[in-house]
Amino acid sequence: MASGVQVADEVCRIFYDMKVRKCSTPEEIKKRKKAVIFCLSADKKCIIVEEGKEILVGDVGVTITDPFKHFVGMLPEKDCRYALYDASFETKESRKEELMFFLWAPELAPLKSKMIYASSKDAIKKKFQGIKHECQANGPEDLNRACIAEKLGGSLIVAFEGCPV
């Protein structure tokens, strides 16, 4: 079911910047986005970047100690959102970083909001080619480290964002 909602160019640019890791200077790496939250525009016709709802790589360990906990705290309690999160995790063999796409549709969100976000998900996913991991979360219990580790690879994952799972 398509909703006719468009995806803003800035959303696509941010996805590309997060997906493509160029050889960068330490200053450029600090400005790279760790997480970004997207919402619908006021007229509900376009998916846009939510103002002020991002975590930069340079903030991790400086102003933000636990980036995933901070990310979860940025999600609204009573409305839906889309998000990209650059997950850092360890398997038994190696350390990895992979993008995760989230549809946040909490129980307390209005039914109309849940319907439009669910029906617009394909529009944003088509723009996000190459995403390996997708997660729909309906409450904070869906966003604990064990649930996320399961999405990333189950029993192969030994740590997520530096914390054992």
Swiss-Prot record:
Motif (Nuclear localization signal): 30-34
PTM annotation, UniProt: ISGylated.
Alphabetical list of InterPro entries matching this protein: ADF-H (IPR002108), ADF-H/Gelsolin-like_dom_sf (IPR029006), ADF/Cofilin (IPR017904)
Residues covered by the ADF-H domain: 4-153
PTM annotation (N6-acetyllysine): residues: 19
Any one GO MF annotation of this record: actin filament binding
Modified residues (N-acetylalanine): 2
The keyword Metal-binding is annotated on this UniProt entry: no
GO biological process: actin filament fragmentation; actin filament severing; positive regulation of actin filament depolymerization
Tissues with expression: Widely distributed in various tissues.
Gene Ontology cellular component list: actin cytoskeleton; cortical actin cytoskeleton; cytoplasm
A Pfam family annotated for this UniProt entry: Cofilin_ADF
Family: Belongs to the actin-binding proteins ADF family.
Record-linked PANTHER family: COFILIN-RELATED
The name this protein goes by in its record: Destrin
The species this protein was found in: Sus scrofa (Pig)
Biological classification of the source: Eukaryota, Metazoa, Chordata, Craniata, Vertebrata
